[in-house]
């Protein structure tokens, strides 16, 4: 668990004790001192790009971030996602002649510090050249696929069809989330989803800790996710379904108030008032 989560629970417990008259509240609050010795220096980040399929103007994007949290080995978040991009690309190369739309495989740099790689791609590519985006993040903790659809129903339907075809578990969520590289595209109305996995672990599990190591992963989980994601991307790239773009205004108006506050507080709100 991350230290912040533990501290918040301690503070909440102290507050509860004080409210119930079973403790002093303030007296029970933990006192924390932190001494930080670090430096931030300019550096260069890159996106790695490959393509499969015909040379069409429009492309289906399959993406993941290649960086990890600064204290983490990053096996599941997001080494597994980057490996999946390569594996799905390999599988699609075997049926390249079937594809009607080019598939662009991208591993973004600098996700953990602000989605910089994804923003660069979104800002330097005309919207009409991006059919849709499937972003892989933390997708190897189990064989239970979860897709955050951000309200793009056409993309949700494709993953539901794939899950039915393979008799595979699937959960979906409609909430528009600014967490993950897909957000750089979603905010512009480009259809984009985040594919991950769920497990019995709470929260992000080992993510963002030193314990996010390769020994926690199971190659069978990776194989299952590669199969499902390949089937979905294949459907997008063969024209079986069209993922409809939305206006920036419709995206803006559908964002939950909590995320609106978060984005504005962090200086990341992308819309004019």
Predicted feature descriptions by range:
Residues 19, 85, 185-186:
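Hydrophobic residues within well-ordered alpha-helices
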Residues 49-51, 60-63, 104-107, 131-136, ...:
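Structural recognition of the beta-strand scaffold that forms the well-ordered cores
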Residues 35-37, 108, 173-175:
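Conserved beta-strand termini and adjacent loop/short-helix elements that scaffold enzyme active sites
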Residues 3, 39-41, 54-56, 66-70, ...:
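Solvent-exposed loop/turn segments at secondary-structure junctions
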Residues 44-47, 68-154, 244:
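Acidic/histidine-rich catalytic neighborhood of metal-dependent amide-processing enzymes
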Residues 2-12, 141-272:
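Active-site-adjacent substrate-binding region
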Residues 1-75, 90, 94-102:
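Soluble metallo-hydrolase cores and metallopeptidase-like ectodomains found primarily
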Residues 28, 32-34, 39-40, 75-79, ...:
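Extracytoplasmic/periplasmic mature domains of Sec-exported, cell-envelope-associated bacterial proteins
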């Amino acid at each position: 668990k991350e230290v912040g989560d533990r501290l918040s629970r301690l503070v909440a417990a102290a507050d509860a004790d004080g409210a119930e008259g079973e403790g002093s509240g303030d007296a029970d609050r933990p006192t924390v001192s932190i001494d930080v010795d670090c430096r931030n220096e300019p550096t260069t980040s890159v996106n790695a790009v490959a393509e499969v399929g015909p040379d069409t103007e429009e492309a289906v994007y399959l993406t993941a971030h290649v960086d990890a949290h600064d204290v983490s080995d990053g096996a599941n978040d997001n080494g597994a996602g980057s490996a999946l991009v390569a594996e799905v690309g390999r599988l699609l190369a075997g049926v390249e002649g079937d594809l009607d739309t080019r598939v662009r495989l991208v591993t973004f740099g600098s996700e953990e510090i602000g989605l910089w790689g994804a923003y660069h791609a979104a800002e330097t590519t005309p919207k009409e050249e991006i059919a849709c985006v499937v972003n892989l993040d933390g997708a190897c903790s189990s064989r239970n696929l979860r897709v955050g659809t951000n309200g793009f129903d056409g993309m949700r339907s494709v993953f539901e069809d794939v899950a039915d075809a393979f008799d595979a578990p699937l959960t979906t969520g409609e909430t528009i989330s600014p967490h993950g590289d897909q957000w750089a595209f979603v905010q512009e109305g480009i259809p984009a989803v985040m594919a991950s996995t769920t497990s019995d672990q709470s929260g992000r599990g080992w993510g963002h800790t030193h314990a996010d190591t390769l020994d926690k992963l199971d190659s069978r989980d990776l194989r299952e996710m590669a199969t499902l994601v390949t089937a979905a991307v294949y459907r997008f790239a063969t024209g079986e379904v069209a993922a409809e773009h939305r206006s920036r205004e419709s995206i803006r108006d559908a964002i939950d108030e909590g995320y609106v506050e978060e984005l504005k507080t962090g200086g990341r709100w992308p819309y004019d008032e």
